[in-house]
Structures are given as C-alpha cells and as structure tokens.
Amino acid sequence: MKIRIGIAGYGNLGRGVECAVHHAPDLELVALLTRRNPASIKTHTGVPVYRMSDAAKLRDQIDVMILCGGSANDLPEQTPELAQYFNVIDSFDTHAKIPEHFSRVDAACRKAHTIGIISVGWDPGMFSLNRVISQAILPNGKDYTFWGKGVSQGHSDAVRRIEGVKDARQYTIPVEAALERVRSGENPTLTTREKHTRECFVVAQEGADRAKIEEAIKTMPNYFADYDTTVHFISEEEMKREHSGIPHGGRVFRCGATAGNPTHRTGISFRTITSSNIA
C-alpha cells in the first residue's frame, strides 16, 4: 500500500516535492492545495488541485500533507491549521522561532492525534543531524555553520512580500575571513554579523518608494537586521538574465580537541553544494 501524499502550496518547493513524490515507488500524490484559483494551476503530473479552504474535505484521502509555503508568513499559520486534519511535514526555517513554531504545531497535533515533523530541509535538517553526530564524536568543541554563497529562497520570499516589491533574490554570502579563522583551528567566537553578509537584488513596482523598501529589508527581524545587507534595485530584464538560477549550499564545522588536550586539534566538516534548486 502506498503512502498517500498531499502538497500545500505550488511554488518552486511544491513543484520539487511533486517531482520527488512522482519518482518514489512507495508514495502516491493524490491532491494539491492552493490559495490561488485551482483552475490557474498547471501541474507536471496532472494531480487534482483544490482550494486551501477545502482541506478538511480531504482528510480521509491523504496520509501525509507536505507544506511548501514560506516560513515568514505561511507556515506559522498553515502547519498548525492543517495538522487538524493530516499528518504534516514542513520546512520552517526561521531558526529563532522554531521553538515557538514547535509548540503551536505540537499542540495542534496532540489535539487531533496527528503527527507533525517540522523544519525538514538542509538547514535546519541535514545540517542539524550532522551537528548532533559531530557533537557526539567531538564533545569538547564548537559548532560553526556557514551558508552560501547562494540564493536563500526563504529570504527572497520575505523580500517579495514587502509592499512595492515585484520580484527579489537574496544571496547569503559567507565572510571569507571568518571561514579561514574556523578552518585554521582558532575556534573563534563569531557574531552573526561577522559570519555572513546578505545581498538583495530587487525589482520595485512602478512608483514604489525605494528608500522605504530598502529600510524595510535592512530592519527586518530574524532575516536582515543582524547582518550587513546591501540592496540593489534592478530591472525585470536584469533579474531574468542574471538571477534566474537558485544555487545554494553551505558548510557545518565542529572544531575542538581530543583527549582533553587543547593541542590535539580535531575538526569535522560537512558540506552541501547545489547548482540550482529550481524544480
């Protein structure tokens, strides 16, 4: 018997999940939920499309609902809501708010007797697992995580939701000097700002207040406020020509010492490289 899958949201992530389910012999995609007009959605596999508001009607047809919305505004509401009807999986990645998100989803799942798995992805996700393994192997040490250089889909989505923004890409860029200090075994104490910079390329709507948009980006909590952020306003043509791909990746380091001797330096690292996350 195949596991019956539903997808909530049909952006780049939703299309990627659709392709992954299609290639998994033990999974069956039975429905797609969207906030848009279902008639406007053209899927790769021809799966039936329903309005998000019709979710409750599908509760006996779906075993697991995979949520593919954004962490800024979608998942905080959608995951606990859909957990009333289905076992759910999401990729919530606002690190500072994961405990709060867990509490809300956990409460909804306990009430409905469903199961929720949150923050699945590469970080949080694969990187989280590698931190646990590295900490078990090297308990006397420090963890370091560097993302990029690459396009953060979540941060790009957060920028696109700002009033006056037509399109946006956000690049997360590791600070090379910080990377080198970690690689050298220095075990530095680094602030958020010292580890990464952020660079935004924004297509503004005609007549939009660009100064207001830039201020909204640079002061956005949990996304940009703690980083040195550069904002570039560009044309739609330049966006399509120069920023149509979605490459990303990152590295996790565990640096420390063995046998209680600080001179016996040991390092563990894990890296992901993705040329493009476009489905």
Language model segments and positions:
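C-terminal substrate-binding/catalytic lobe of Rossmann-fold NAD(P)-dependent oxidoreductases
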Residues: R4, G16, H23-S53, V151-I278
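Hydrophobic/small residue at the entry helix of a nucleotide-binding pocket
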Residues: L13
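Glycine-rich Rossmann-fold phosphate-binding loop(s) that bind the pyrophosphate
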Residues: Y10
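General beta-strand structural signal in soluble alpha/beta enzymes
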Residues: D90-S91, G116-V120, F146, Q170
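Oxidoreductase and adenylate-handling cofactor-binding alpha/beta cores
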Residues: M126-K142, D157-Y171
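Rossmann-fold NAD(P) dinucleotide-binding segment
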Residues: A55-V64, A72-S91
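Hydrophobic Val/Ile/Leu positions in short beta-strands of Rossmann-like dinucleotide-binding domains
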Residues: I5-I7, L67
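Rossmann-fold NAD(P)-binding glycine/threonine-rich loop
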Residues: F92-G116
